[in-house]
Every structure is written in structure tokens, then in C-alpha cells.
Amino acid sequence: MEGIERENGCFHTFCPIASVAWLHRKIKDSFFLIVGTHTCAHFIQTALDVMVYAHSRFGFAVLEESDLVAASPTAELAKVVEDIKAEWQPKVIFLLSTCSCDILKLDLENSSKDLTIRFGFPVVPVQTSGLDRTFTQGEDAVLHALLPFVPKEDPKVAVVEEKKRSWFSFGKDEGNKASVPAAPTRNLVLVGAVTDSTTQQLQWELKQLGLERVDVFPSGDITNMPVINEHTVIVPLQPYLSDTLATLRRERGAKVLTTLLPIGPDGTARFLEAICAEFGLDASPVAEREAQTWRSLESQRALLRGKRIMFLGDNLLEIPLARFLTACGAEVVEAGTPYVHAKDLSEEIARLREKGVPIVESPNFSAQVERIDRLRPDLIVAGLGICNPLEAAGYTTAWSIEFTFAQIHGFVNAIDLIKLFVKPLLKRQALLEQGWTEAGWMS
């Protein structure tokens, strides 16, 4: 796409299996079983240690040497599923594959079918290999695997019986056995595994604007997913759901509304206005709601105004976050991101192009280091493994993973979003006031 530079660099990001951190909380009565090596298990234990010890609804089936020569992994997986069923009684088990499964050519698809028949509840295979996916795309893979559970028609249809008089009815009415379903209506579905409180806030905002029914995919219950068909308007809440959105367009005929993501006051306002325009609602109250939110953020905006900020690329949230920062008055010197889904992010990209923000897809880290030395940004947003070396070199950093786990959508959460950028700047200022520049590691 014009205005986007591609460098074909390596990903510096978490493995997609880490997406279980928020997905196991979103989908109730589920269990996420990751099939991988000891290395994969150690990664999850290190990255999500608190959740592991909290006895969360995810676990590991560790591949051993004997599995390499086994005809099928089904028998060993069945033992693990048996234990999960006894302890958790799940309605669904997601069987997450890793790059090890891809390399060893393990047939988890057929194993999942066999396990589903054997245990009487869905065992769903999910492709979460880190070979060609980034951290947050694990969510996209899980939502895509959930689509077969999404109904195409509302089971609650109004039945209309045609009454007519029969010659031999003796004055009584007889109902025609043929029933007519109710006329289909348009419905709105927000797509993305955000927290329940975030979806409730967005539903409340839309209800205030006159839209009573707002569904969310995924819902917390696998047996109660929203109807999605050709009468459905889909609005994504996250920038990394391209496979799910493409399938809904192609197979369900749903309309995917392209607008800004509801991240920051500006994005939330345009998000609500686009929905109102689609459903013929009055969006005039949105402007005051946006202005009110911006006023509440003014003290934080003052700290960001004029600051030079650079994204190295990690969780695919970089483009909407960069757009929000430009609205705050900051100068984004580079928005690096692993992938750019131009079709679904066309509005976001257009905003950055208007501001002259360089967008770099799949950035080369060595080239980025050279650009860092040349541009000298005030704040660098990067992955955990890169932040510490940059801090040692005298740069101020923000962990990109914090934006993944924080609630950053909607007007209410805008204060938490902006604080994630302001906090490291305030920390650096406090260190400078304490004379830490004398240590030589901070320039």
C-alpha cells in the first residue's frame, strides 16, 4: 500500500499461545490446552506465572520423544482431556498448536474430531503457531475457530399461523400448519475479546444514542453466540482480526464497517458516529462526549505534546495507538508494526498519512536501531526483551505488552490509556531530578 514501507524483518514479539492470558477469562466454561514442547511450557510459566499458580483454565500437553514416532497423538491427548474433564467440566476445549506441531506434522485436526466424538463436547483445533503469527493474532485464530458455533439465523423466530375457516369446521377456526418466520432485522455485532466491562461501556454508549441491541462476539457462553448473517453489521474492536473478518465477509455475507477503532476519545467518537450513520441514528451527542473526555485528559496531554515517540512493532496495536498520540499533539517519528491489514485499517492509516507519520511493516531491528540513534525519540514503545537494552542506552521506553492487557477502549478507559504513555516519561523526569544522569547510563 502506498505510504507504507516494508523491511521484511524478524518478529520481536511473544508467541501467539500467550493469548490464552485473556481468552480463558473471556470464554466461560472453556479450557485451553496447548500442545508443545518444554520450551513452550517454560515460556508460558515465565510470561504468565501469576495465572499459572492461580489455577487458571489453561494447561499444557508436553510433547515427549515417544510422541515423535507415534502414529497419532490422539491416545495421549485423550488421557489429558480425561483429566481436564474430571477437574473442570468444560463445555469446550481449545486445542492450540505450536510451531513444534507444525514442524513435526502432528495431525491435531483429526485428533480433535476423534476427541469430540469420544467425550461428547467440542474439542476445537486452533492454529496458533508462532512461525507466521504474532502475539495478538492468537486471538484471531481462536475467534476464527469459534465461527462454526455462531448461528446464521436467530432460533427465536416469531411463528405466524394463518387462520382460515373450513367447510366442515362447524364455525371453528383451524390453524394452517405452515409457519412463517419473522422478517429478518439488521443487527450490530462488536467483534473482539475485550473485557466485559469494556463491552458494557460501549453498549451503554450506543444505547444512549438509540441502539438498543448490541451483540458481542465472542460472548462468554459458547452456546449463546450472536447471530451473524447477511443482515449483520460487524465492527471490529481490535486491529488484528483480519482472518475472522474476512471469513465473516465471505461466508456469512456480513458487512464489516470500516472506521477508527474505539481507542482514545477521537477513535471512540468516530467509531460511534460511523455506527450511527449506518443505522440512521442521531450522533450529535457524541461530539460533546468526546470534548468532555479530552478536557479530562488535558494535564496528561500537556506532557505528551511535542514529544517524539517511536513504535518498534510488537502487538499490532501500533497504528491506532500512533493515531491517538498524534491527536494528543505528540510527534510519532515511526509506527513500526509486524503486519498492516490495509483493508480493515484504511481509516486509521489515512489519519496517520495526513499527519505524515512513517509506517513501517515488518521492520528490520538493526535498521531501527540506526534510526533510533538518528531520531533520538523521547519515548520508545517496544517489547519486553528490547526495552531493557534501550533503557541501558539512555532511552525511555514503554512496554508494548501493557497496552495488550490494559483496558484501553472507549471514553471511560481513555485516562488509563494515556497514563501508559505518560508514566515512563514521569519516571524519567523523576530520575533526572534525583541526579541519575551522573551514573552515565542515562543521557
Curated annotation (Swiss-Prot):
<dbReference type="InterPro" id="IPR050293">
    <property type="entry name" value="LIPOR_BchN/ChlN"/>
</dbReference>
<feature type="binding site">
    <location>
        <position position="99"/>
    </location>
    <ligand>
        <name>[4Fe-4S] cluster</name>
    </ligand>
</feature>
<comment type="subunit">
    <text>Protochlorophyllide reductase is composed of three subunits; BchL, BchN and BchB. Forms a heterotetramer of two BchB and two BchN subunits.</text>
</comment>
<dbReference type="Pfam" id="PF00148">
    <property type="entry name" value="Oxidored_nitro"/>
</dbReference>
<feature type="binding site">
    <location>
        <position position="40"/>
    </location>
    <ligand>
        <name>[4Fe-4S] cluster</name>
    </ligand>
</feature>
<keyword id="KW-0067">ATP-binding</keyword>
<keyword id="KW-0479">Metal-binding</keyword>
<keyword id="KW-0547">Nucleotide-binding</keyword>
<dbReference type="GO" id="GO:0005524">
    <property type="term" value="F:ATP binding"/>
</dbReference>
<dbReference type="GO" id="GO:0019685">
    <property type="term" value="P:photosynthesis, dark reaction"/>
</dbReference>
<keyword id="KW-0004">4Fe-4S</keyword>
<comment type="pathway">
    <text>Porphyrin-containing compound metabolism; bacteriochlorophyll biosynthesis (light-independent).</text>
</comment>
<keyword id="KW-0411">Iron-sulfur</keyword>
<dbReference type="InterPro" id="IPR005970">
    <property type="entry name" value="Protochl_reductN"/>
</dbReference>
<dbReference type="GO" id="GO:0016730">
    <property type="term" value="F:oxidoreductase activity, acting on iron-sulfur proteins as donors"/>
</dbReference>
<dbReference type="GO" id="GO:0046872">
    <property type="term" value="F:metal ion binding"/>
</dbReference>
<dbReference type="GO" id="GO:0016636">
    <property type="term" value="F:oxidoreductase activity, acting on the CH-CH group of donors, iron-sulfur protein as acceptor"/>
</dbReference>
<keyword id="KW-0560">Oxidoreductase</keyword>
<comment type="function">
    <text>Component of the dark-operative protochlorophyllide reductase (DPOR) that uses Mg-ATP and reduced ferredoxin to reduce ring D of protochlorophyllide (Pchlide) to form chlorophyllide a (Chlide). This reaction is light-independent. The NB-protein (BchN-BchB) is the catalytic component of the complex.</text>
</comment>
<dbReference type="GO" id="GO:0036070">
    <property type="term" value="P:light-independent bacteriochlorophyll biosynthetic process"/>
</dbReference>
<protein>
    <recommendedName>
        <fullName>Light-independent protochlorophyllide reductase subunit N</fullName>
        <ecNumber>1.3.7.7</ecNumber>
    </recommendedName>
</protein>
<dbReference type="GO" id="GO:0051539">
    <property type="term" value="F:4 iron, 4 sulfur cluster binding"/>
</dbReference>
<keyword id="KW-0149">Chlorophyll biosynthesis</keyword>
<keyword id="KW-0602">Photosynthesis</keyword>
<feature type="binding site">
    <location>
        <position position="15"/>
    </location>
    <ligand>
        <name>[4Fe-4S] cluster</name>
    </ligand>
</feature>
<dbReference type="InterPro" id="IPR000510">
    <property type="entry name" value="Nase/OxRdtase_comp1"/>
</dbReference>
<comment type="similarity">
    <text>Belongs to the BchN/ChlN family.</text>
</comment>
<keyword id="KW-0077">Bacteriochlorophyll biosynthesis</keyword>
<keyword id="KW-0408">Iron</keyword>
